[in-house]
C-alpha cells in the first residue's frame, strides 16, 4: 500500500485527486454530498483538515479527526480495489437550489485517471458506487440500521455527523 500511495501522490496532478476505500463510497449522491459539504467548509474557512482531499475523506468517514478519517476511509493493505476521486472545480452559489452540478463531469478527467491506474498497475472497473454493510462498518457507523432507512441514508446520516 505504501508503494501504491507513493506512486499515486507522485502521479496526481494536484491535491484535488485522492484515493478512497472502495466500500466507503455508497453512491454518487453520497460522494456529491460529501464534496458539497467539503466545498462549503472551504468557502466558510471551517475545514478541519489542511487540504480539500483530506477534508473530503474526513467527511466521508463521518469524523472530526483527520487521522481516523485516513484509517477508515483511506486505502488499507487488505484492499483490492479503490476509487480514484477528483474533486471538481465548481463554484457554489450561496443558495443550494441555485447550484447545478453536471453529474457527467467525472468524464472530463478520464485520461488522467486511466494514466494513473495504469502506472499503479491497476485496472479500470466499470462499476458505480453501491452502499454496503461492509462500508458502513468500515466508517464505524454506530447507529442501528432500521429497515425503514436505506443503506444509502445511513451513509448520508453518518456523513452529516462530521460537521456536528
Give residue ranges: language-model regions.
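Proteins with a high burden of low-complexity, intrinsically disordered sequence enriched in S/T/G/P/A and R
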Residues: 1, 29, 161-163
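Long, hydrophobic N-terminal alpha-helical segment
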Residues: 1-23
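Hydrophobic side chains in well-ordered alpha-helices
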Residues: 4-7, 69, 96-97
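Hydrophobic, Leu/Ile/Phe/Ala-enriched alpha-helical segments that form helix-helix packing faces
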Residues: 8-12, 73, 117
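Short, low-complexity, polar/charged sequence segments that are solvent-exposed and flexible
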Residues: 10-14, 38-40, 103-104
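Short, intrinsically disordered low-complexity segments
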Residues: 20-46, 128-145
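Ordered, amphipathic secondary-structure segments that act as subunit-interaction surfaces
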Residues: 28-87
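Glycine-rich, aromatic-bearing surface loops/beta-hairpins
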Residues: 75-164
Amino acid at each position: 500500500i505504501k508503494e501504491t500511495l507513493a506512486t499515486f501522490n507522485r502521479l496526481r496532478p494536484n491535491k484535488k485527486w485522492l484515493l478512497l476505500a472502495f466500500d466507503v463510497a455508497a453512491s454518487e449522491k453520497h460522494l456529491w454530498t460529501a464534496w458539497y459539504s467539503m466545498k462549503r467548509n472551504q468557502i466558510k474557512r471551517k475545514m478541519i483538515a489542511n487540504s480539500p482531499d483530506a477534508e473530503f475523506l474526513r467527511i466521508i468517514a463521518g469524523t472530526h479527526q483527520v487521522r481516523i478519517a485516513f484509517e477508515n476511509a483511506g486505502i488499507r493493505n487488505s484492499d483490492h480495489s479503490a476509487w480514484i476521486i477528483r474533486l471538481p472545480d465548481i463554484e457554489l452559489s450561496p443558495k443550494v437550489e441555485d447550484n447545478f452540478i453536471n453529474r457527467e463531469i467525472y468524464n472530463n478527467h478520464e485520461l488522467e485517471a486511466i494514466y494513473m491506474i495504469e502506472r499503479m498497475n491497476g485496472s479500470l472497473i466499470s462499476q458505480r458506487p453501491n452502499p454496503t454493510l461492509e462500508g458502513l462498518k468500515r466508517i464505524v457507523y454506530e447507529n442501528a440500521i432500521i429497515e425503514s432507512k436505506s443503506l444509502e441514508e445511513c451513509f448520508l446520516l453518518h456523513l452529516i455527523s462530521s460537521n456536528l
